[in-house]
């Protein structure tokens, strides 16, 4: 009787172990239409792969700041008048203001048209936002829910296209470049 009970318990234990280790699919934490990682992380990775020859830093853009200063920060960084089309934004710029370089990355809110947001960014940004210098090369690209606007002064031996190429390696192959 003890052997019979031991065999039944052993079989039950084996079945429970096998069913517990069965191949279940992991739960997806992001939608297939979303790029993984924060825009700050993505910007830092782009700069790590496409280095610049100046000290710069990534700053998060507060999309909830409705003050005049907050709205100016959103407009001068993204070119957008309406931050409601975004869920997050960050910018990489030089620590010295006399270098014309700005790389901004935004995550577009669900339901918004990513290409329309990109076009609004390009038409709304001021390439002369610095006092004495101007960006003469600008591109906007996007993949899934992320848009990157890069503008720079080519006298620093940089091109916007090189950053778009790096965007493709870090974020995903661009769906458009404008």
Model-derived regions, located:
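A short, solvent-exposed beta-edge/loop patch
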Residues: 95, 107, 132-176
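An anionic, turn-rich surface loop/hairpin at beta-sheet edges
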Residues: 118-139
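C-terminal motif of bacterial Sec signal peptides marking the signal peptidase cleavage site
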Residues: 16-20
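Short amphipathic alpha-helices in soluble, non-transmembrane regions
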Residues: 117-124, 162-168
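Bacterial signal peptide processing site
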Residues: 22-25
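A short acidic-to-branched-hydrophobic micro-motif
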Residues: 99-110
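Positively charged n-region of N-terminal signal peptides that target proteins for export
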Residues: 1-4, 11
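Surface-exposed, low-hydrophobicity interaction/linker segments
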Residues: 35-94, 114, 118
């Amino acid at each position: 009787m003890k052997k019979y009970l031991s065999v039944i318990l052993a079989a039950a234990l084996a079945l429970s172990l096998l069913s517990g280790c069965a191949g279940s699919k992991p739960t997806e934490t992001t939608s297939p239409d979303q790029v993984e990682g924060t825009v700050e992380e993505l910007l830092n990775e782009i700069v790590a792969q496409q280095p610049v020859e100046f000290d710069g830093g990534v700053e998060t853009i507060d999309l909830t700041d409705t003050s005049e200063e907050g709205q100016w920060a959103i407009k001068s960084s993204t070119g957008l008048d309406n931050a409601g089309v975004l869920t997050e934004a960050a910018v990489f710029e030089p620590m010295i203001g006399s270098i014309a370089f700005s790389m901004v990355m935004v995550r577009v809110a669900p339901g918004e048209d990513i290409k329309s947001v990109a076009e609004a960014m390009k038409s709304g940004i001021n390439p002369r936002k610095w006092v004495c210098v101007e960006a003469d090369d600008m591109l906007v690209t996007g993949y899934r829910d992320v848009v990157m606007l890069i503008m720079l002064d080519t006298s620093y031996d940089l091109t916007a296209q090189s950053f778009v190429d790096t965007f493709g390696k870090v974020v995903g192959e661009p769906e458009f470049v404008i």
